[in-house]
Amino acid sequence: MAKVTERYDVTWEEMRDKMRKWREENSRNSEQIMEVGEELINDYASKLGDDIWIIYEQVMIAALDYGRDDLALFCLQELRRQFPGSHRVKRLTGMRFEAMERYDDAIQLYDRILQEDPTNTAARKRKIAIRKAQGKTVEAIRELNEYLEQFVGDQEAWHELAELYINEHDYAKAAFCLEELMMTNPHNHLYCQQYAEVKYTQGGLENLELSRKYFAQALKLNNRNMRALFGLYMSASHIASNPKASAKMKKDNIKYASWAANQINRAYQFAGRSKKETKYSLKAVEDMLETLQITQS
């Protein structure tokens, strides 16, 4: 097989820069990273200077994703030789154990890292990833809660915890996690949308009102969020048909649901879909409007 430099007529400097770009973008295109990186390592290691070490790490992670343990081990051995005792290299060793499904060995290694450095967030997160891979959701939740006691500002961890609670159908705790995220990211429409979905799932008039409010907020932040638009329709429709809702509340929510249904209708008309797709999409919206008319009568 021809080399990357020959196939694409690129220089090793361009390949190095491409690897850097993928790192900066957190790209997980493992096959490409492995192909370009392996050629850099094999043919241009002496020219890369200190960049070689981060490329070894990058290629190793890609090789683990792709099932190339031979390449992953080679990169790991080079890193061990250069950085003996490094916690970062030990974490990479743990990730190789994970890829081999040697979870107990990986956990023991991460625990040793944490004994030496309790603030090592990467090792803690790897332990949580293992619990999830093993299907031990309760343990993953416990570990995440312990982690967040020390690193309360980690938004990624709060979102991961919310997802785990949703999987366990513990919607009250999931809502709490999403509230934490919305406090620090009030302009993130996806957090508003997900919070609205959780409240919708919890049900009951009060939760449905909150659901409608946050679906509306998600739409305000991103008027192209179709999921929030459908959510607004559904939550308003359920409030309008709720026997505990006052007459004014029913009237207002019929208006909100009607507006949402019309917006959905317009969105499909502007989407440039095929006539057949548009026909079925519009029929679904017409059914929504019909339901509203039944509720209103």
Curated annotation (Swiss-Prot):
Question: Which Pfam families does the record associate with it?
Answer: TPR_EMC2
Does the keyword Membrane feature in the UniProt annotation? yes
Which positions make up the signal peptide? none
Q: Which residues form a coiled coil?
A: none
Modified-residue entries (N-acetylalanine), positions: 2
Q: Could you describe the post-translational modifications of this protein?
A: Ubiquitinated when soluble in the cytoplasm, leading to its degradation by the proteasome. Interaction with EMC2 prevents its ubiquitination and degradation.
Residue positions where N6-acetyllysine is found in the record: 255
Keywords of the record, alphabetical order, are: Acetylation, Endoplasmic reticulum, Membrane, Repeat, TPR repeat, Ubl conjugation
Ranges occupied by TPR repeats: 87-120, 155-188, 192-225
**Alphabetized InterPro entries for the sequence:** EMC2-like, TPR-like_helical_dom_sf, TPR_EMC2, TPR_rpt
| Annotated compartments | Endoplasmic reticulum membrane
| GO MF annotations, alphabetized | membrane insertase activity
What topology in the membrane does the UniProt record assign? Answer: Peripheral membrane protein
Q: What is the protein's major site of localization?
A: endoplasmic reticulum
- An example Gene Ontology cellular component term from the record? endoplasmic reticulum
What does the sequence similarity comment in the record state about its family? Belongs to the EMC2 family.
Subunit structure comment from the entry: Component of the ER membrane protein complex (EMC). Interacts with WNK1 (via amphipathic alpha-helix region); promoting the ER membrane protein complex assembly by preventing EMC2 ubiquitination.
Protein role? Part of the endoplasmic reticulum membrane protein complex (EMC) that enables the energy-independent insertion into endoplasmic reticulum membranes of newly synthesized membrane proteins. Preferentially accommodates proteins with transmembrane domains that are weakly hydrophobic or contain destabilizing features such as charged and aromatic residues. Involved in the cotranslational insertion of multi-pass membrane proteins in which stop-transfer membrane-anchor sequences become ER membrane spanning helices.
| Stated name of the protein | ER membrane protein complex subunit 2
Gene name, Swiss-Prot/TrEMBL:
Emc2
